[in-house]
Amino acid sequence: MLTRLFKEPSLLPDMQKFGGWVDDSGSEDSKTKDEEQERCRLGDEDLDEGSVKGGGSRAQSEIAGEEDYDEDVDEDDCGEEGDGDRPKKRGPKKRKMTPARLERSKVRRQKANARERTRMHDLNSALDNLLKVVPCYSKTQKLSKIETLRLAKNYIWALSEILRNGKRPDVVSYVQTLCKGLSQPTTNLVAGCLQLNSRNFLTEQCQEGVRFHTPTPSFSIQSYPYQCSRLSSTNCQSGSSTHSLRNHSLCSAYEALYTEGTSPEYISADFEGHHGPPVCVNGNFGVRQEEPLSPDAERGYQYSMHYTNLHGSRSSAAHGITCGPPGARSGSVHSENLPLFHDVHMHHDRTPAYEELNAFFHS
């Protein structure tokens, strides 16, 4: 393979071209560097002229700040040199509190306090003027700021509703609109300013019976059929009737024990009234009131009852006894005076059927 030598004349022009390029690039770099240096010099001269024109006070403050900073830096450097091996702290240097700096901070704080005090005085005076307009005035009680603003909002809303409807509103509805979201003392003040009793206002608010419920004079008892497992009878009679405050009912099979209508009597001087048919609730027995037929029956016995003119045997009818409630309880009426069936005092011998019935209640 043949090789060319660089000494051949055909290759020399190319080499000369490359050398020219290198010279041109070097001259261009030097030119750019010279231009940059000239620009920096011009910028420095302009800055110097602007600082001179800026004013003496600003220049003096900047110079003083630089001197303070230089002093702090020198002190820190001295301290670090004295400490020796301690690492240098990075970050902004904390300026030393001089008496002049303390005085300036004190003046700034006093000015801020004065501005806040003036603002609060203006706010309080505006709220006082607002209280003179809204329908709530009291010499002894002063509303809080939030209550005053809420009352003013409600008052504006009520006036806008009056203008929208074009008619005079009811006093109660007007007060309700004013007192929406207010506390009870503020509500009382508003009602007093409008010459409306707060009790009547509350009563009008609760017309639908949310607060005040009046009991009805008569109560009805719901009857439920129950199975009496311990007795020979399987079904209990059920019924419903309207009762007064105290009611006593007796099962029909238990009434059959007393042939001439001389059933056990319980006379109460507190509550008397009409009584309905026998009812069975929860397998408990009750005693029915009827008109007294004997002088002994007219006596009121609190914890016992007299049985008079008892005819026939209990054994034939005891197996057909059905259950009835022990005096229907209505509302909050107590039944301490009601005698239980197993507390009845009998003057006759107890039959096995009665013993079985008594054992049911004692268990």
UniProtKB/Swiss-Prot annotation:
Annotated localization: Nucleus
InterPro entries the UniProt entry points to: bHLH_dom, bHLH_transcription_factors, HLH_DNA-bd_sf, NeuroD_DUF, TF_bHLH_NeuroD
Principal localisation: nucleus
Identification of the protein by name: Neurogenic differentiation factor 2
Start and end residues of each stretch annotated as Disordered: 1-116
Expression by tissue: In adult, expressed strongly in brain and more weakly in skin, muscle, eye and ovary.
Record's compositionally biased regions (Basic and acidic residues): 28-44
Biased composition range(s): Acidic residues: 64-83
Disulfide bonds: none
Keyword hit for Transmembrane: no
Swiss-Prot/TrEMBL keywords: Activator, Developmental protein, Differentiation, DNA-binding, Neurogenesis, Nucleus, Transcription, Transcription regulation
Quaternary organization: Efficient DNA binding requires dimerization with another bHLH protein.
Basic residues bias spans: 87-98
GO biological process: axon development; positive regulation of transcription by RNA polymerase II; sensory organ development
Pfam families associated with the record: HLH, Neuro_bHLH
SMART domains: HLH
Cellular-component GO terms for this entry: nucleus
Highest rank taxon of the organism: Eukaryota
One of the record's GO molecular function terms: DNA-binding transcription factor activity, RNA polymerase II-specific
Domain bHLH residue range list: 107-159
Function: Transcriptional regulator. Appears to mediate neuronal differentiation.
Motif mapping: Nuclear localization signal: 93-99
Protein's UniProt keywords contain Cell cycle: no
